[in-house]
């Protein structure tokens, strides 16, 4: 048994040495910006359209071996929901602004000039601001003419956010083009699925679920330090 352990250690060491001879790690920093399209998955459901908001952040990437690396980001992202009143002349949306911190596995393929990549991993977010936008009084709408309150949940209009820390998982695909050895630009589309509810979800609460989902489209720039 001892011989097998020693042999395994020697084999791993030799493979690592070979890999290091053929590939040197690369560390890059960058920035990105784009748009976030989001909804909140309510149960019972709330009629919605996509809520659009800005997103921007900084990126850190370490390529540790050929075709694989790690990405960490610190992003500002505005999510929320926008209610659908169909033909009624009313509007309501809630802006929820977060600092999002994803840690992603980075898998890429291609040449030195152009690469395609896939990113996936966990993400945590901290709500830093919220804002309600409406063209009616959210505390006194029952007397409004033609307001579609029948068969519609309205408690969320003025309900305070209970959970201001979100966590979930995200995955995205994109492409990167090298300008030269140290500079590159990229585009990415990413999907986020939140696992925490913004409102209470106990039996006594109105909503059994109120988690975020979002689609982010961004363009970014990387500068290679190493």
Where are the regions a protein language model picked out?
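Residues that define the transmembrane beta-barrel architecture of outer-membrane proteins
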Residues: 25-27, 48-54, 95-101, 114, ...
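Short glycine/proline- and aromatic-enriched beta-strand/turn motifs that initiate or cap beta-hairpins
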Residues: 19-59, 162, 224-226
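Flexible, solvent-exposed coil segments and beta strand-coil junctions
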Residues: 34-41, 80-87, 146-155, 195-201
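Predominantly the C-terminal beta-signal and adjacent terminal strand-loop region
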Residues: 146-148, 166, 171, 177-226
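Extracellular loop and loop/strand-boundary signature of outer-membrane beta-barrel proteins
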Residues: 41-47, 86-92, 156-161, 202-207
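Sec-dependent N-terminal signal peptides
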Residues: 4-13
């Amino acid at each position: 048994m001892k011989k097998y352990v020693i042999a395994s250690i020697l084999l791993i060491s030799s493979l690592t040495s070979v890999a290091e001879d053929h590939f040197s790690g690369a560390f890059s920093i960058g920035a990105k910006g784009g748009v976030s399209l989001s909804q909140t998955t309510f149960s019972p459901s709330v009629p919605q359209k996509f809520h659009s908001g800005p997103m921007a952040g900084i990126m850190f990437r370490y390529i540790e071996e050929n075709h694989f690396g790690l990405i960490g980001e610190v992003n500002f992202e505005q999510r929320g929901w926008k209610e659908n009143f169909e033909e009624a002349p009313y509007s309501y949306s809630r802006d929820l602004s977060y600092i999002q911190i994803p840690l992603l596995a980075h898998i890429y393929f291609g040449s030195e000039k152009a690469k395609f990549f896939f990113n996936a991993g966990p993400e945590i977010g901290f709500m830093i601001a919220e804002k309600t936008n409406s063209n009616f009084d959210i505390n006194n709408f029952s007397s409004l003419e033609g307001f579609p309150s029948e068969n519609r949940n309205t408690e969320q209009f003025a309900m305070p956010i209970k959970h201001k820390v979100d966590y979930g998982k995200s995955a995205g695909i994109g492409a990167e083009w090298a300008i030269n050895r140290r500079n590159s630009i990229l585009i990415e589309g990413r999907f986020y699925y939140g696992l925490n509810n913004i409102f209470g979800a106990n039996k006594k609460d109105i909503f059994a679920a109120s988690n975020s989902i979002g689609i982010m489209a961004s363009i970014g720039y990387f500068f290679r330090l190493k």
